[in-house]
Amino acid sequence: MSEKQVFSTEWAGKTLSVEVGQLAKQASGAALIRYGDTVVLTAAVGSKKPRPGDFFPLTVNYEEKMYSVGKVPGGFLKREGRPSDRATLTARLIDRPIRPLFAEGFRNEVQITSTVFSVDQDCSPEMAAMLGSSVALVISDIPFEGPIAGVDVGRIDGKYVINPTIEQAEKSDISLTVAGTYDAINMVEAGAKEVSEEAMLEAIMFGHEEIKRLCEFQQQIIAAVGKEKREIELFVSDPELEAEVKAASEGKMKAAIKTEEKKAREAAIEDVKEEILESYKAKELENEAEILSEVAHILEMIEKDEMRRLISQDKIRPDGRKVNEIRPLSSEVGMLPRVHGSGLFTRGQTQALSVCTLAPLREHQIIDGLGTEEYKRFMHHYNFPQFSVGETGPRRAPGRREIGHGALGERALQYVIPSEEEFPYTIRLVSEVLESNGSSSQASICGSTLAMLDAGVPIKAPVAGIAMGLVKLGDDYTILSDIQGMEDHFGDMDFKVAGTKDGITALQMDIKIDGLSRQILDEALTQAKEGRLHILEHLTSTISAPREELSAYAPKIITLNIKPEKIKDVIGPGGKQINAIIDETGVKIDIEQDGTVYIASQDQAMNRKAIAIIEDIVREVEVGEVYTGKVRRIEKFGAFVELFKGTDGLVHISELAHERVGKVEDILKLGDEVTVKVIEVDQQGRVNLSRKALLEKKEQPEGDKKPQAEKKFYPKTKKPESK
């Protein structure tokens, strides 16, 4: 496969081409994807030998190159650094549909790297990278049960659209990414504007039709350039040892799993495992370490199989709940006295404390990635400390999981956030997971709803989230509501659904089997709605509406509208004027290009003072108006009076009084307050004032009046002609 080969098709009205054989030829498989003007190279490499251990070491990287959009990276080094949140989320998005399609027991390391070379804003590099990852794997010698494909789906005026453009996405009420094989769906990620379960299911199935077409397209590529798959040594337990361990643990594991409380159950299961491991240690076998590792793996599989059998056949969950039963709920608001809003949400042994912070709009987050520069005024961050599951270990920066869960919560709550005009604040939510036994991301959504209501944020409606699970044995399946950690770990699906009472706002699905049918998806969505409404009822019983007043410690923001041409007057030369206002009042000021002014401070009196100053600066003088101002400067020809902040006018000496004034100081002194009338604003904007126009003209007594000389008008005479 040394010569370049190109395969083309149409994708959402744009040309899609896959080029193989020219680039990255030393990788196990590589493909250059051209979608419109978007270009992404994906390379897949698989190690020849398996790694020790009982896990599959798959790594997916998505690398954004700033040159792809004609930008130079910021910062001192001027080169790409750690992945952006968007790149991290994209890597997770690609990993999730690919991982289930490697064989059970696959232990060879696989690394997939997608590098973005060029970006057309209307042709998603994320979807190109997902397709490229599948192509790179299916044409390589790495055993992989693909192909897969992914598409974005939108809905505009009730009509579904594949890979919507930026303009279309802004009008869409669904933002869905769906991935899968020709036969089934195995990954869903969605945000929505309170859409129904039926509409979301139709969007998923609409996307799957396009996925089928892309999988057929990849089959053509496989037939032309696909390599023969290599033989891989899969991790398989020794049948005799497996039977021996099963016999030793029979009955004991079942009883341990049925222990309802999490910590007690974990201890009981650990006791069973430890007892059996100790029995093998006592045998003093030659290859003891290898045998003990295999026994531990077999015990893990026995635990998994027994939990799945209890749920599927006996309909018994580890904690004794029914399959559609929600764990006990409790919640509280206002726990933290100095924060702007807080909410504690507990569901069984999962607990999240969410905190809401309000800030001026200037504290938004600037997003400068491969798209156009934008800013976010709403953020949700998720933290998962190890003490939440009773473990120790180093505390590191947020990883892929924490970034992903934070983004899911943000997507779920985004639709209910009030507009900038309604609520001119930057809103940051932080969810601290204090206990975890499954569904912590959904607990963070519930806690965040409580925190915003406690902070007085006028959200459109409360949002709740629930995680659904699945245990599928052959054709028999059981859907679980509100899964706990063990059911998530050993189950076949983690299906998170968040929304209001009127519809879905976010959806995320990961599965460990090949895919799901429409029937299972439909039932899971219906069961999730029942659980969501139950949780919403609990949340609104704790706090039913936003608090009428913001916290005393939250900034109070007042909005003022001025003419855009007056912005320069408020800012002043070099920012002198606006900085003077900030220094005098201690407020924070943001001015938009349309003339909207946001003034923020915890002290309302200072807010009002700043508004008064700005109103003075932008006030326009009108002829005939009367003002009271201070004398700021005196010259021989008159006095300059400050009418209001930033606006002076001249009272000419002849306009000080009706009688003749010898010196200005005879009437006015520096700092005097004087009432004046505007008599003229000239073409240069200079203001002329009069004091005497407001004074009554004094009448002289009859005896004091001097007789006026009679005015005589003389006729004009001709000058004598010169001779």
Curated annotation (Swiss-Prot):
UniProt region (Disordered), positions on chain: 692-723
Class of the enzyme per the UniProt entry, highest EC level: transferase
Cofactor(s) essential for the protein: Mg(2+)
Keyword set, alphabetical order: Cytoplasm, Magnesium, Metal-binding, Nucleotidyltransferase, RNA-binding, Transferase
Subcellular location: Cytoplasm
Enzyme Commission identifier(s): 2.7.7.8
Entry annotated with the keyword NAD: no
Record-annotated S1 motif domain positions: 624-692
Record flagged with keyword Cytoplasm: yes
GO biological processes: mRNA catabolic process; RNA processing
Reaction(s) the record says it catalyses: RNA(n+1) + phosphate = RNA(n) + a ribonucleoside 5'-diphosphate
Domain annotation KH: ranges: 555-614
InterPro entries xrefs: ExoRNase_PH_dom1 (IPR001247), ExoRNase_PH_dom2 (IPR015847), ExoRNase_PH_dom2_sf (IPR036345), KH_dom (IPR004087), KH_dom_type_1 (IPR004088), KH_dom_type_1_sf (IPR036612), NA-bd_OB-fold (IPR012340), PNPase (IPR012162)
GO molecular function: 3'-5'-RNA exonuclease activity; magnesium ion binding; polyribonucleotide nucleotidyltransferase activity; RNA binding
A GO CC annotation given for this chain: cytosol
Sites where the protein binds Mg(2+): 488, 494
Composition bias type Basic and acidic residues, residue spans: 693-723
Domain of life: Bacteria
PROSITE patterns: KH_TYPE_1, S1
Family as reported in the entry's similarity comment: Belongs to the polyribonucleotide nucleotidyltransferase family.
Role played: Involved in mRNA degradation. Catalyzes the phosphorolysis of single-stranded polyribonucleotides processively in the 3'- to 5'-direction.
UniProt name for this protein: Polyribonucleotide nucleotidyltransferase
